[in-house]
């Protein structure tokens, strides 16, 4: 609800994390754009050293106390935005520093951590603590901690898009039509929701003209004489 409130004000959601958590968060920002047809600026990720470091093992960057805040300032962060931090240990300097800067600037924050009573949880306005316990390989938080963060992240971003009206029923009616698979899925969703339209090729032309299932339905509603 807190994130939704910020987005309604025209704000953005920023994910901030290092290692596994940061990479999973960045993946989510990419996936939600296509699945829900949103602009890439609505949900963004902040990663140590910048997004260009995602595929490189420069984990020392997570000790930088100012890099994350500087990245946010470059994006003109404001009180209308929301920052969600990720840290398995709950102590990552990069994330903790960002949350502290946000608090000073009056920017609301949340976090997902995997240890109880962690400094990052104490610094966030809306902490989520998922206590996963020791990893099978000690310290390798890409396992249980990373998996739990991915599930919580999915819950947050999915419920947020549902509440914004980007999903109807359980269908991606706003998905971007960027390949044959998604175009075909959009056609099948449209025909399932509108069984009176049975000509697949004509539906496909309509979908491509409109840009999404939802826009196609709106187009039909406004122009009932369309040949479909």
Predicted ranges, named:
Residues 194-228:
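NTP-binding/hydrolysis catalytic cores, primarily Walker-type P-loop NTPases
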Residues 13-151, 157-164:
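Glycine-rich phosphate-binding loops that contact phosphosugars or nucleotide phosphates
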Residues 1-10, 76-78:
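Glycine-rich phosphate/diphosphate-binding loops that line cofactor/substrate pockets in enzymes
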Residues 154, 158-194, 200:
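Internal, active-site/partner-interface "lid" segment
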Residues 33, 121, 161, 191-195, ...:
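Residue-level preference for well-ordered alpha-helical positions
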């Amino acid at each position: 609800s807190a994130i939704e409130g910020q987005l309604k004000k025209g704000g953005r959601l920023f994910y901030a994390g290092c290692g596994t958590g940061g990479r999973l968060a960045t993946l989510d920002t990419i996936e939600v754009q296509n699945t829900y047809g949103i602009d890439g600026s609505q949900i963004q990720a902040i990663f140590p050293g910048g997004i260009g470091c995602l595929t490189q093992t420069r984990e020392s960057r997570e000790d930088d106390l100012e890099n994350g805040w500087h990245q946010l300032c470059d994006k003109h962060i404001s009180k209308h935005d929301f920052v969600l931090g990720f840290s398995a240990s709950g102590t990552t300097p990069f994330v903790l520093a960002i949350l502290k800067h946000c608090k000073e600037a009056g920017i609301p924050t949340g976090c997902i951590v995997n240890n109880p009573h962690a400094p990052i949880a104490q610094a966030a306005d809306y902490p989520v603590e998922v206590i996963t316990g020791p990893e099978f390989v000690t310290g390798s938080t890409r396992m249980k901690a990373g998996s739990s963060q991915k599930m919580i992240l999915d819950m947050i971003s999915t419920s947020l898009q549902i509440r914004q009206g980007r999903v109807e029923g359980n269908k991606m009616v706003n998905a971007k039509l960027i390949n044959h698979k998604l175009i075909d899925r959009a056609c099948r969703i449209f025909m399932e929701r509108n069984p009176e339209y049975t000509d697949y090729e004509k539906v496909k032309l309509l979908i491509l003209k409109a840009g999404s299932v939802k826009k196609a339905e709106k187009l039909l509603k406004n122009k009932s004489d369309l040949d479909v």
